[in-house]
Regions:
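Hydrophobic, membrane-facing alpha-helical anchors
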Residues: 62-72, 97-104, 175
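Short membrane-interface loop/juxtamembrane segments of multi-pass integral membrane proteins
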Residues: 170-183
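Membrane-embedded multi-pass helical conduit in multi-pass membrane proteins
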Residues: 82-168, 183-258
Length: 258
């Protein structure tokens, strides 16, 4: 049993595969357990997962060492690298603002070139991913999910990448009870901050179009569209912080007794 990281289950699975044991997917429910009851608890759980997976990537990298097949190496590495999405996601949410505020090019290209090359690639990759994932995952909800976590997992994952021995195991709170409906301002303040920045960029971009005769209108419009997309995602992420009152007296799990 691996004890060097805070995600001992994933690390133990990696070690078992290295020793020649096989993994199998069984398409039937064999166990049930409680999930986190609030967004704050869910984020704390994912912080531990993210830190632990990056620790494994540093301490017992699946791309190296003996015992794994190439598909296993790719599968484990993909699961670990996934949790490094925090910083790229934050950069994506801030990327259109330098041009809107300071006329600084993030993508040094004309509006026509962006329409000709960037947009087709984005559309193609989105459709391809959705086709591969079928109805099991949906691109837009995945973006919202990553946006919710990005602000909070960025620092822990970067620290684990630099110094994998830092960090401690924190037990995920489960079985708690929400006695009233409330909005978690503490968790949502990061999203609200990004909403304010993007909304300010939207207003200033429209102001530049209206007042600057030399403004590159098409590029400004592309960045405004980018900002509007960010606002849609951030608005949905903020809405998740609304915690509903629980009316059930105890958790219930569907089962079939034969």
């Amino acid at each position: 049993i691996a004890v060097e990281t805070v995600t001992e289950d994933a690390h133990t699975s990696l070690r078992l595969n290295r020793k020649g044991y096989s993994s199998a997917f069984i398409s039937m429910p064999l166990a049930a357990g409680l999930a986190t009851e609030s967004l704050a608890d869910h984020i704390n759980q994912r912080i531990r997962w993210a830190r632990g997976m990056v620790q494994i990537f540093r301490i017992d990298n699946p791309l190296f060492g003996k015992g794994l097949t190439i598909p296993q190496r790719i599968c484990f590495a993909n699961a670990m690298i996934h949790f490094l999405h925090g910083l790229p996601r934050i950069i994506f949410l801030l990327a259109p603002l330098p041009f809107l505020f300071f006329n600084v090019y993030v993508i040094f290209a004309s509006g026509l070139m962006i329409f000709a090359y960037v947009l087709p690639h984005m559309v193609h990759s989105t459709i391809t991913n959705q086709k591969i994932q079928d109805n099991k995952r949906f691109y837009f909800w995945g973006v919202i999910y990553e946006t919710i976590l990005s602000w909070y997992i960025t620092v822990p994952t970067l620290v684990a990448l630099i110094s994998p021995k830092h960090g401690k195991f924190n037990v995920t709170a489960k079985g708690e009870y929400n006695e009233e409906t409330y909005f978690d301002w503490t968790v949502s303040k990061s999203y609200i901050f990004l909403i304010i920045l993007n909304f300010a960029g939207l207003i200033y971009g429209l102001y530049r179009i209206a007042t600057d005769p030399y403004a590159e209108v098409w590029i400004i419009l592309i960045n405004i569209a980018w900002v509007c997309y960010n606002l849609l995602v951030l608005g949905a992420a903020s809405a998740v912080a609304l915690e509903r009152k629980q009316v059930r007296s105890s958790p219930r799990v569907a089962c079939n007794i034969r």
